[in-house]
Amino acid sequence: DIGILQDGFPRESNVVIEVGGVRTNFRMPDILAIGLGGGSLVSADGKTIGPQSVGHNLVSEGLVFGGKTLTATDIVVATGLVEIGESSHVAGLRPETREAATLEISRMLNAGIEKMKPSSDPLPVILVGGGAVLITEDLAAASSMLRPEHAGVANAIGAAIAQIGGESERLVSYEKIPRQEAVQEVTQEAMALALAAGADSASLRVADVE
């Protein structure tokens, strides 16, 4: 999955998001899912990766774990740049397959990043989550690549340090109240909601105004 951080916060989606087939009216991050992960299935010639995946069964079905299914994880282990499972299990992988799959992984990532960027300029890319292990070389769409400590468990860390926030919306008539005054009032309402939810008053700041 690929997202964009703006001022330290995920960029919000401007389209309706469906969760389990249900249309929602929530603020949701703008995320592009490209169907590429450690368990993604790789074709015999290496030219097609995903979107099918062995998912959590990677540790039993992937070649490096003693299974019989060629996955993206097997490809990066075969390059010799990543140590996961038993590399001897992919020693017989054809070089053409490994090279084709490595190129396809890079192509998918670069295409996804280009689609999400607000401009054509390269941006820093932060690699987190289990799928980050698939990125073993520089990406053309990235100005730099950052791999934080404990990046593999970023989801758990994010859940543990999630920030408390408040949100307020109101329809106003600028004939009755100036815009700036209306914004200030709604901002105060949002801050009050954040404080009521347990936010620290010393660290409150406005994340976004529409």
Model-derived regions: residue spans:
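Helical "lid/coupling" subdomains associated with nucleotide-phosphate turnover
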Residues: 3-210
